């Protein structure tokens, strides 16, 4: 899959799927998570997210895009930075995300930087 590096508001990207740096709990976090929830329609996305429960670090899951101009939101539960071991976890997040992308035949994706803080 070819790629481009674009600096833009991820909620305004015209792609099939955007990736969210998700909270492990069904709450709206800061940064990218907050921006995506608000652009998608906070109440609808949060209600859907509540049905899924809690997740662990490196878990990934798809939700509908709701009011966003994308079909899917791929939520990646990114780790908190805790030194060198975090590098392997971030790598695992990207691997898990690309596995879901491939399994769902998603052709265009916008990624934020994962585990960089809000």
What are the residue ranges of the model-derived segments?
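Macrodomain-like recognition of ADP-ribose-binding/processing modules
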Residues: 1-118
């Amino acid at each position: 899959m070819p790629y481009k590096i674009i600096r833009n508001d991820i909620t305004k990207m015209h792609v099939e799927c955007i990736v969210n740096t998700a909270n492990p709990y069904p709450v709206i976090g800061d940064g990218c998570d907050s921006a995506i929830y608000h652009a998608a329609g906070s109440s609808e996305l949060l209600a859907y997210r509540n049905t899924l429960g809690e997740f662990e670090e490196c878990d990934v899951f798809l939700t509908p895009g709701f009011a966003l101009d994308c079909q899917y939101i791929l939520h990646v539960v990114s780790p908190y930075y805790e030194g060198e071991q975090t590098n392997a976890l971030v790598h695992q997040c990207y691997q898990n995300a690309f596995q879901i992308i491939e399994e769902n035949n998603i052709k265009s994706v916008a990624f934020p930087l994962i585990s960089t803080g809000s």
